[in-house]
């Protein structure tokens, strides 16, 4: 249990989990709150009484490669060998088999488990080992078993247990390839991706464009081959990005976003060049009529600070956020104008070695969208890549009689039972729409309004009396006693009997597993009620299908897995509980279409590529670049997370499907007959932003200036899954995908928050079409556009930018005021005239020149005060102190080294850090690499380093904002002990760097001469 205390203990609220507590704190803007964890440690199971420490427990799932052999004798032989081996290395655990899956838990030390799991993973008797849990444990739960084995048939004949084990394991294994790589890596480490805190990191980011893909989509003769083109593009990107140490973040309609760590910049460029060569080789090998001969790529590369985080709640994306992501996208767009296949920023050039730098050619300074300052870019000496030439080649292309490997078929031409479930046909209660002024929902309520139910179209063709089965899992909102379970059984038995429903309900350690059988209308109605039942949370359907006859004869077969089954095999509840929790986590990252197809009992690899007409939606935050430039990375994550949750809520409530979450941008689609629903979703999104601004109007919160624009367009898209190298993407691509982004951008010029194209307007209801839209002066690609009429739907970009700059200025003034208030508080004497104030009272910014530096005789510097100074300055700014930095400062008080490389989350933390390290007069080495140091604040850094009379090494590497050396020259002049200043990855000219080193060498020689002279006089 977690307790949130705020207003100096006057208000207290309890929560069941930390995530719920954090959401409430953020939504309520509680800045002075403290979270306390209250828990009771249970007694260790038998085997944990030995006093062993540093133990770890690992649970994994795998699929048998020879399920026909896996009987009780086979498992017994396997367990006998494992027991002998595990006994020697001190590993305990159990093995459970439920055809065709193995579930195994092993316990031991880190070294033993790493060795054993490496051998297990390479065992040919199973495949696809997926870690379900991996973490430290206080003792052994299965200490008496070096390897306990059991076949599910030896534990129970209960069909519910077998059903849930098979269905969840099958779905879990199938969804694995659709996961973002970062989320998959988290799971392999035994971590829940949607529980991970945002992690700041320095990355080399690229956007890889499939050149003129929109022209390919617009070519009527190439529609059938689009799936083949996307599959080849995905495989080529994955192979070259991951082969050079990078990670693919996501695919976005013919665009690949990828990143590399800071030390793999050269590898990144090599991989991107190899990608271009691979596609050239692929083009040369194609027969006449193959559209693969039209694949070209272009890339833009940038380096900067980003936040690796989980964005979104109900539909999530584990991705990168930050200003450098937007800049990388702009550089790729600039490469189209410059006609080059690979373009990189100056920041990336700074990370390269001398040999690769010599291969680069300057492409000049260019203004890009969203940035006030021009960007310096570079290119390799490579053949020109002109999009106009590629477009002409595509337009003149004749596929002839060539047939695609994965042909795309029209959606309407398929039999209803064969159509993939690309639309959410969930029955919804009709609720009256209310306008913005009538809404009184809290922020938490608005973020949680998400309805999702997986009904495949194959089940919609049957009548209401069709016999179906539905299995779902959920977590109990609170622990269930025997009395609670008896009450549920009594009420449910009578209700199910009257509705002609049979089934079973299994309760396992806080987890409900229920199977319902009966007429479709009755089962659907009951399931909808269960989703609203406050005794459940995280309700997810795992299997649905028509059936010929019932499996269960009773209206409710109630089973608590704490009785006879667990007496036979107690670890069963651990397997079920962990498997269900992992499935719930995965479901948020996988496309809804794939989840619905899986839930119906199908293999997602059999999804038919289709072409279909849809209403496409795109939305993003207005003026996000100026808003995010002066916000911390955590604040950027908060803004995006709040906005994404609101968008997914509104879209799903209106029957839409979220396609991609791209930073602050959300794309989605609606059925062609749901234009009104799409407009209503747009109105909900815009209304939410207005409510957000009102909610935080009186506080300096970054969400108080959030506004958005939304665009709607209509057209044909292709839906297909692509990829075969361990990563699968469900792609929604079409000419309308690119055009809708232009429609959304038109909202700024039109002054309307919602802009729709004429094809969408033609599909609106007469009332909305005739009275609710107004023509825009401009269109997109010759298509007329309309804005939604109403004062609440107006958008003034000038006012939005004014509010953003005003917010940044107000926050800066508030920070200065807090500093002044802290200095002149009652009980403190005001500083005498001409005497500088303490570091805490100094305004955050450069206040004096290093050239005229004189020690302040009234200033006491104490290394033990560094952490306190940092925390105080952060609190005065209204920011939460970075615990990692505070710990480093605390450690440096008793050490002569301080390594803060890549530790800062944003420029807002730099000034408190500089004031704090001034206290550390004992330092010999200071690492400030990759920490937002630039020409505007290097003077403050130099002033902080002057009192460090023992300082010998200062590392300022990978700070591309550094271009001038005047402050560093003054530092060397006043602190002659400095022997080395590392400036790799900065924009300081090599000649200036050599001059600095010469000055330090002179200081060293002078010090040596003084030392020798004093030695002679001493004699």
Curated annotation (Swiss-Prot):
<dbReference type="InterPro" id="IPR029787">
    <property type="entry name" value="Nucleotide_cyclase"/>
</dbReference>
<comment type="similarity">
    <text>Belongs to the adenylyl cyclase class-4/guanylyl cyclase family.</text>
</comment>
<keyword id="KW-0115">cAMP biosynthesis</keyword>
<dbReference type="GO" id="GO:0005524">
    <property type="term" value="F:ATP binding"/>
</dbReference>
<keyword id="KW-0285">Flavoprotein</keyword>
<feature type="domain" description="Guanylate cyclase 2">
    <location>
        <begin position="615"/>
        <end position="744"/>
    </location>
</feature>
<keyword id="KW-0969">Cilium</keyword>
<protein>
    <recommendedName>
        <fullName>Photoactivated adenylate cyclase subunit alpha</fullName>
        <ecNumber>4.6.1.1</ecNumber>
    </recommendedName>
</protein>
<dbReference type="InterPro" id="IPR036046">
    <property type="entry name" value="Acylphosphatase-like_dom_sf"/>
</dbReference>
<dbReference type="InterPro" id="IPR050697">
    <property type="entry name" value="Adenylyl/Guanylyl_Cyclase_3/4"/>
</dbReference>
<dbReference type="GO" id="GO:0009882">
    <property type="term" value="F:blue light photoreceptor activity"/>
</dbReference>
<keyword id="KW-0677">Repeat</keyword>
<keyword id="KW-0600">Photoreceptor protein</keyword>
<feature type="region of interest" description="Disordered">
    <location>
        <begin position="822"/>
        <end position="859"/>
    </location>
</feature>
<keyword id="KW-0067">ATP-binding</keyword>
<dbReference type="GO" id="GO:0004016">
    <property type="term" value="F:adenylate cyclase activity"/>
</dbReference>
<dbReference type="GO" id="GO:0071949">
    <property type="term" value="F:FAD binding"/>
</dbReference>
<dbReference type="Pfam" id="PF00211">
    <property type="entry name" value="Guanylate_cyc"/>
</dbReference>
<keyword id="KW-0966">Cell projection</keyword>
<keyword id="KW-0456">Lyase</keyword>
<keyword id="KW-0274">FAD</keyword>
<comment type="subunit">
    <text>Heterotetramer of two alpha and two beta subunits.</text>
</comment>
<dbReference type="GO" id="GO:0031514">
    <property type="term" value="C:motile cilium"/>
</dbReference>
<dbReference type="InterPro" id="IPR007024">
    <property type="entry name" value="BLUF_domain"/>
</dbReference>
<feature type="domain" description="Guanylate cyclase 1">
    <location>
        <begin position="204"/>
        <end position="332"/>
    </location>
</feature>
<dbReference type="GO" id="GO:0006171">
    <property type="term" value="P:cAMP biosynthetic process"/>
</dbReference>
<dbReference type="GO" id="GO:0009881">
    <property type="term" value="F:photoreceptor activity"/>
</dbReference>
<keyword id="KW-0675">Receptor</keyword>
<feature type="domain" description="BLUF 2">
    <location>
        <begin position="467"/>
        <end position="559"/>
    </location>
</feature>
<feature type="compositionally biased region" description="Low complexity">
    <location>
        <begin position="822"/>
        <end position="839"/>
    </location>
</feature>
<dbReference type="InterPro" id="IPR001054">
    <property type="entry name" value="A/G_cyclase"/>
</dbReference>
<keyword id="KW-0547">Nucleotide-binding</keyword>
<keyword id="KW-0716">Sensory transduction</keyword>
<dbReference type="Pfam" id="PF04940">
    <property type="entry name" value="BLUF"/>
</dbReference>
<keyword id="KW-0282">Flagellum</keyword>
<feature type="domain" description="BLUF 1">
    <location>
        <begin position="55"/>
        <end position="148"/>
    </location>
</feature>
<feature type="compositionally biased region" description="Polar residues">
    <location>
        <begin position="846"/>
        <end position="857"/>
    </location>
</feature>
<keyword id="KW-0157">Chromophore</keyword>
<comment type="function">
    <text>Acts as a photoreceptor for the step-up photophobic response.</text>
</comment>
<dbReference type="InterPro" id="IPR032675">
    <property type="entry name" value="LRR_dom_sf"/>
</dbReference>
């Amino acid at each position: 249990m977690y307790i949130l205390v705020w207003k100096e203990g006057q208000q207290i609220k309890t929560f069941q989990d930390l995530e719920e507590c954090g959401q409430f704190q953020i939504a309520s803007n509680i800045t002075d709150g403290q979270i306390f964890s209250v828990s009771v440690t249970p007694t260790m199971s038998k085997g944990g009484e030995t006093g062993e420490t540093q133990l770890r427990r690992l649970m994994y799932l795998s699929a048998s490669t020879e399920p026909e052999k896996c009987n009780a004798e086979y498992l017994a032989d396997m367990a006998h060998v494992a027991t002998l081996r595990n006994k020697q290395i001190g590993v305990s655990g159990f093995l459970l088999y439920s055809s065709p899956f193995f579930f195994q838990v092993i316990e031991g030390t880190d070294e033993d488990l790493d060795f054993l799991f490496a051998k297990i993973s390479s065992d040919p008797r199973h495949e696809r080992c997926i870690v379900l849990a991996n973490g430290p444990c206080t003792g052994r739960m299965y200490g008496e078993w070096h390897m306990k084995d059991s076949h599910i048939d030896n534990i129970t004949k209960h069909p519910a247990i077998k059903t849930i084990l098979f269905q969840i394991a099958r779905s879990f294994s199938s969804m694995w390839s659709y996961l973002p790589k970062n989320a998959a890596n988290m799971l392999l480490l035994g971590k829940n991706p949607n529980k991970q805190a945002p992690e700041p990191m320095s990355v080399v980011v690229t956007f890889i464009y499939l050149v003129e893909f929109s022209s390919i989509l617009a070519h009527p003769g190439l529609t059938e081959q689009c799936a083949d083109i996307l599959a080849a593009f995905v495989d080529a990107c994955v192979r070259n990005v991951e082969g050079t140490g990078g990670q693919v973040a996501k695919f976005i309609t013919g665009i690949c976003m990828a990143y590399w760590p800071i030390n793999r910049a050269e590898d990144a460029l090599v991989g991107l060049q190899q990608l271009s060569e691979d596609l050239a080789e692929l083009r040369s090998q194609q027969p006449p009529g193959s559209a693969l001969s039209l694949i070209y790529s272009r890339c833009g590369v940038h380096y900067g600070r980003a936040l690796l985080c989980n964005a979104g709640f109900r539909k999530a994306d584990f991705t990168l956020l930050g200003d450098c992501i937007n800049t990388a996208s702009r550089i790729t767009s600039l490469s189209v104008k410059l006609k080059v296949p690979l373009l990189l920023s100056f920041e990336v050039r700074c990370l390269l070695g001398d040999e690769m730098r010599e291969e680069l050619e300057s492409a000049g300074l260019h203004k890009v969208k969203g940035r006030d300052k021009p960007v310096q870019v570079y290119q390799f000496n490579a053949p020109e890549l002109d999009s106009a030439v590629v477009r002409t080649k595509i337009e003149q292309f004749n596929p002839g009689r060539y047939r695609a490997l994965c042909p795309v078929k029209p959606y309407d031409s398929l039999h209803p039972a064969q159509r993939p479930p690309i639309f959410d046909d969930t029955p919804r209660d009709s609720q009256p729409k209310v306008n913005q002024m009538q809404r009184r929902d809290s922020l938490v309520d608005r973020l949680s309004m998400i309805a999702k139910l997986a009904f495949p179209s194959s089940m919609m063709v049957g009548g209401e009396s069709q016999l179906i089965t539905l299995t779902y899992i959920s977590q109990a909102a609170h622990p269930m006693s025997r009395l609670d379970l008896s009450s549920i059984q009594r009420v449910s038995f009578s209700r199910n009997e009257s509705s002609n429903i049979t089934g079973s309900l299994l309760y396992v350690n806080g987890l409900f597993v229920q199977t319902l059988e009966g007429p479709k209308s009755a089962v659907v109605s009951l399931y909808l009620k269960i989703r609203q039942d406050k005794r459940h949370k995280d309700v997810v359907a795992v299997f649905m299908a028509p059936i010929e006859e019932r499996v269960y004869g009773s209206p409710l077969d109630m089973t608590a897995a704490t009785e006879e089954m667990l007496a036979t095999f107690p670890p069963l509840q651990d397997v079920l509980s962990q498997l269900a929790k992992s499935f719930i986590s995965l479901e948020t990252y996988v496309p809804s279409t794939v989840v619905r197809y899986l839930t119906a009992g199908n293999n997602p690899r059999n999804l038919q590529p289709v072409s279909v007409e849809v209403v496409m939606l795109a939305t993003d935050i207005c003026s996000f670049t100026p808003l995010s430039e002066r916000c911390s990375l955590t604040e950027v994550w908060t803004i995006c997370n709040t906005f994404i949750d609101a968008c997914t809520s509104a879209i799903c409530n209106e029957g839409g499907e979220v396609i991609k979450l791209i930073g602050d941008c959300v794309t989605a689609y609606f059925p062609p007959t749901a234009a009104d629903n799409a407009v209503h979703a747009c109105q909900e999104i815009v209304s939410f932003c207005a409510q957000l601004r009102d909610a935080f109007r009186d506080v300096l919160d970054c969400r108080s200036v959030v506004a958005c624009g939304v665009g709607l367009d209509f057209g044909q898209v292709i839906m297909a899954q692509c990829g075969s190298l361990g990563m699968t993407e469900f792609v929604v691509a079409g000419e309308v995908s690119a055009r809708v982004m232009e429609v959304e951008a038109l909202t700024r010029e039109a002054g309307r928050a919602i802009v729709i194209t004429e094809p969408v307007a033609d599909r609106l209801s007469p009332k909305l079409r005739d009275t609710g839209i107004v023509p825009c002066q401009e269109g997109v690609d010759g298509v007329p556009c309309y804005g939604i009429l109403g004062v609440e739907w107006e958008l003034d970009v000038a006012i939005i930018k004014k509010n953003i700059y005003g917010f940044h200025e107000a926050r800066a003034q508030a920070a200065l005021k807090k500093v002044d208030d802290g200095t002149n508080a009652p009980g403190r004497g005001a500083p005498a005239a001409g005497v500088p104030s303490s570091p805490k009272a100094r305004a955050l910014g450069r206040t004096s020149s290093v050239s005229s530096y004189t020690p302040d005789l009234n200033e006491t510097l104490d290394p033990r005060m560094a952490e306190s100074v940092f925390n105080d300055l952060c609190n005065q700014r209204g920011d939460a102190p970075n615990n990692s930095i505070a710990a480093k400062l605390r450690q440096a008080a008793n050490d002569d080294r301080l390594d803060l490389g890549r530790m800062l989350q944003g420029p807002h933390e730099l000034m408190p850090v500089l004031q704090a390290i001034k206290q550390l007069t004992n330092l010999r080495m200071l690492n400030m690499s990759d920490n937002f140091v630039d020409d505007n604040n290097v003077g403050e850094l130099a002033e902080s380093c002057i009192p460090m009379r023992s300082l010998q090494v200062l590392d300022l590497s990978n700070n591309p904002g550094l271009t001038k050396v005047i402050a560093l020259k003054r530092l060397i002049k006043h602190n002659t002990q400095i022997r080395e200043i590392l400036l790799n990855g900065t924009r300081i000219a090599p000649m200036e760097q050599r001059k600095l080193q010469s000055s330090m060498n002179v200081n060293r020689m002078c010090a040596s001469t003084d030392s020798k002279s004093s030695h002679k006089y001493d004699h």
